[in-house]
Amino acid sequence: MTDMYASLRSNVSMLGQILGDTMRTHLGDSFLEKVEQIRKLAKDSRRGDEAAREQMLELLTALPDEELVPFAKAFNQFLNLANLSEQFHTISRNCDELVCVPDPVEQLLGRMLNGRVDQTKMLDCLKTLDIDLVLTAHPTEISRRTLIQKYAAIVDCLAEQENNQLSDRERQQINLRLRQLIAQIWHTNEIRRERPTPVDEARWGLSTIEESLWHAVPDFLRQLNDQVQERTGQQLPIDIAPVRFSSWMGGDRDGNPFVTAKVTQEVLDRNRHAAARLFLKDIVLLVGELSMEEANDELKAYTNNSCEPYRFVLRSLRQKLRDTIDYLNARIEGHNPEVDKSTLIWQESDLKAPLEMLYKSLYDCGMRLIANGLLLDILRRLACFGIHMLRLDIRQDAGRHCDVLAELTRYLGMGDFNHWDETEKQAFLLRELSNRRPLIPSNWQPSADVAEVLNTCRLIAKHPAKALGSYVISMASKPSDVLTVLLLLKETGCTHPMRVVPLFETLSDLNNAAACITDLLDIDWYRGYTKGMQEVMIGYSDSAKDAGVMAAAWAQYRAQEQLVAVCNQAGVKLTLFHGRGGSIGRGGGPAHKAILSQPPGSVDGRIRVTEQGEMIRFKFGLPKLAVQSLALYTSAVLEATLLPPPEPKQEWRNCMERIAEESVSAYRGIVREEPDFVAYFRAATPEVELGKLPLGSRPAKRRVDGGIESLRAIPWIFAWSQNRLMLPAWLGAGEALQAACQRGEIGLLQDMEREWPFFSTRISMLEMVYAKAEPNLARYYETCLVSTNLHHLGETLRQRLDLGIKVVLELTKSDTLMAHTPWNRESVKLRNPYIDPLNFLQTELLARTRKETSETPASEHVQLALMLTIAGVAAGMRNTG
């Protein structure tokens, strides 16, 4: 890398050297020399040295079984350490301005208050921002929690090293700690022995809050308050919470038979337990701080003139939190203890009201400096996390709800709900929703699958609304899908209005989304239920798998526009829930750009966005990184609300319509219509092997016997990222853009790229994917793993990749990809020589594994090394799915 990244390069080199010393200590000089030799050959190969490439391949294929695992581990861990160094560089004192952009909130406030936005309007919008980041488990999340914690400790050491006042002894101690941590990592098994359970995944999500977000949220709000006060002279409210957090971990049962009502109950208890435990730590610290005696009349009266009135209140809260933890421990262990709710923190006001009373007393008595310390941080944590820590969404497939009613209507002799048309379904559902008598007979014994759906609904009825988020209906397509869930909730005793959210996922469902919501809002009963609020989820993963990224992106954009128009006409506030993944092929990419590229009027101060597995770690895994991410989200939503992008010109729309039509045709022409595609996909990628890895709790397929259509979007992306072709993230796009150029529309495309955030974001995402794609490596996989009669398909795919790259370079008037984002380009270049050997080794291991028989199974060394190469490539690509 260039000199502008000197501090980053220094950290990468230092950590790499320590890793090398660790390997030398435990495996000897000869092993380390072989690793270094292969690394240097990989670099030479990257420069076009064919002899170096051949020599590297000879060394890799000749590795004895006992060296497979340590070799894969060596390159895997180097890539993880490089990732750490990059993460740290973005929050480092030595961060270069090309990497670390100025604070986005500070920049935005300057632009807004420079005559573009009324100050009062800006403050009102900021105070009411409603950004909900929904943490979701990731079926291909690679890193184990124990390693993530060690990586965080390494970052702490890197931060300590930046202190110029350290003595030589202190620097030696930090270096020793780094050596200890890297040795611990080297001797820790990187691959889980067993799949994580849904509860394990939920605990992983809670650990992110405890280790990072719990600290980051008040830090971010303090920073935001200072910025606003400096610009406007006004303070933000003490209970401001522009960003909150929800979760799908333990609530998402779509296609996951392991997420049961019992599991969801345990996760709800664990969420509340984690919150009580963290608030207890805070209250214990606050008892030590608030030792003063002076108080206002309200606090004096409340504490009977105690000489330590603040501690009097805090000690009571401390005991209530301890009792709450004991109660929740008993529940988690399977007991159902009888309790006096008044002795516990049972609702948010039990904690909020006493703390606000203390805050007001300190304020009234002139101790504002003290009030705005730890006490304010606790109040803001409470506003953000509540006493339930995360609001748990429930997600289930629309068909499962219909099956409940189908079984019930058959039992009642009414026919089969699944065989009724939409008009008949709606008439029945609305009649029963308005009927006070129960529909479900007390003596009915449903099947196990139906009972599970009903048990989940009963669980929802038992819990307070603040513990839960939305009930998301996957594969929704009709108004009856929503009404069915509402009826099931009614019949199971749910009295609080839960948000029931249709998720439109396929291309056809996205195109029909506005019509579906129009029909719903035309129903008087439903309008009354919504109380003027409607949430709709837009699916990115499955729509891209269904139609390709370009057609899916345009369908998502149009669906949002139409939904905004429908809800505006009905006088209903719309919240759009974006089901984005981490990868480009699943709607991922920089969140700031993504939000600013949404249709004008579609954000309006409110947004929900999924944050998945590996992206949670990259964005929120360190407190300072989390502060940056919270600032990016806040500034983007504020800007999209108050300074929305212009409406796209009609000629741009017409062009996108043509591009979408041509791209979906090109995409489906391969994925659906090419008879050899499935066979090629399964041979040229580790898709089959991925299904055997103990990575996530959810099965990789919806149906065991299905083809591409049954494969979940995440492993679909993951498999193609392993062989470096990255196909789902670009297939169809290049062909459509080339067709536009051939129509003489290159100038129009360049105007769109320059002036339309939606289109420019799509092009920049394509650039990033094209830069990561490695057709020569994909060809090597093909040569080693795919039958020669299928090679023609690989050649076609690589030609299409090359076509896409050329047309994007022409469109952007660039000689190289990512010319305008040198940091990203350098990052890709840094990793390639370390990922390449893992790819070549993975190919060899796949070939060995696929030759195994019951008489000659692949050795344990081969199987574990294969898993490590998959983990290493994922770390290097920073892209699982």
Swiss-Prot record:
Q: Write down the required cofactor(s).
A: Mg(2+)
The protein's annotated catalytic reaction(s) are:
oxaloacetate + phosphate = phosphoenolpyruvate + hydrogencarbonate
Keywords associated with the record: Carbon dioxide fixation, Lyase, Magnesium
The organism's superkingdom is given as: Bacteria
SUPFAM superfamilies linked: Phosphoenolpyruvate/pyruvate domain
Q: Name one GO biological process term.
A: carbon fixation
Q: One Pfam family name from the record?
A: PEPcase
Q: Where is the active site?
A: H138, K545
**Membrane spanning residue stretches:** none
Q: What is its EC number?
A: 4.1.1.31
The record ties this protein, via Gene3D superfamilies, to:
Phosphoenolpyruvate/pyruvate domain
Q: Which HAMAP family match?
A: PEPcase_type1 (MF_00595)
Q: What role does this protein play?
A: Forms oxaloacetate, a four-carbon dicarboxylic acid source for the tricarboxylic acid cycle.
Q: Which PANTHER family match?
A: PHOSPHOENOLPYRUVATE CARBOXYLASE
Full protein name: Phosphoenolpyruvate carboxylase
